[in-house]
């Protein structure tokens, strides 16, 4: 079963691109935020398992610090199915794109992410973790294929290191609306947990040049009695 930090890691495999890869999907994309521009998400996410909901709501701040370099900070408020709430695992990350589609055929980036210990004893992971992924993307006109994966150094207590991988295919239905599907897999993240696989669908809709809506729903298809029955994500994105 995904623990609170597992939720954060999975949902944090998100970023944005001109082709609308990344959010709202669990699989990330290699496109960094444009140089000297901002992408700010007001988001909610969670998982439904064993008739209980657990997840986070908060702000995801991204800045294009240099060409091909994105800096990210996430401040989440976490909750669980027992009524506990508090500051979850603050995240700090940097995405660096080292291959470009125009010259190399694919965009490829390295996007390490640090999860700080939760400030609350009741929600979130109680120790630090480190996600080390590679993400790639190929565009075909109005279609985009992106994904990749990596491993999480998450050893502490009953938790253990684990790996994840995913791929998504999206299509621009109109100039404002993009729909997509995804398959995502994660190995067991604790001694008493199981591997999980989900198949999800998402959409992005441009309200204007600077305001965007994102949504995702992904039911589990592997070990659903021990893992999340479904993952969800929604956000209002500001770009400028």
Residue ranges and their predicted role:
Residues 1-26:
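Cleavable N-terminal export/targeting peptides
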Residues 20-240:
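Transmembrane beta-barrel domains of Gram-negative outer membranes and organellar outer membranes
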């Amino acid at each position: 079963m995904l623990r609170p930090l597992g939720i954060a890691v999975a949902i944090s495999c998100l970023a944005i691109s001109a082709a609308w890869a990344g959010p709202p999907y669990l699989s990330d994309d290699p496109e960094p935020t444009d140089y000297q521009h901002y992408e700010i998400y007001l988001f909610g996410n969670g998982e439904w398992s064993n008739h209980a909901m657990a997840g986070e709501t908060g702000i995801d701040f991204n800045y294009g610090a240099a060409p091909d370099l994105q800096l990210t900070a996430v401040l989440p408020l976490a909750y669980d199915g027992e009524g506990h709430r508090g500051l979850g695992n603050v995240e700090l990350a940097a995405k660096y794109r080292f291959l470009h589609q125009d010259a190399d055929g694919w965009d490829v980036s390295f996007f390490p992410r640090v999860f700080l210990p939760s400030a609350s004893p009741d929600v979130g992971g109680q120790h630090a973790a480190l996600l080390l992924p590679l993400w790639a993307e190929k565009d075909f006109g109005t279609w985009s294929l992106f994904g990749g994966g990596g491993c999480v150094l998450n050893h502490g207590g009953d938790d253990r290191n684990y790996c994840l991988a995913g791929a998504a295919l999206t299509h621009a239905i109109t100039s404002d609306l993009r729909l997509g599907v995804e398959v995502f897999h994660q190995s067991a993240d604790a001694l008493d947990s199981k591997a999980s696989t989900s198949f999800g669908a998402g959409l992005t809709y441009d309200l204007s040049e600077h305001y965007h809506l994102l949504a995702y729903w992904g039911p589990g298809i592997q070990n659903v009695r021990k893992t999340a029955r479904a993952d969800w994500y929604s956000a209002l994105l500001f770009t400028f």
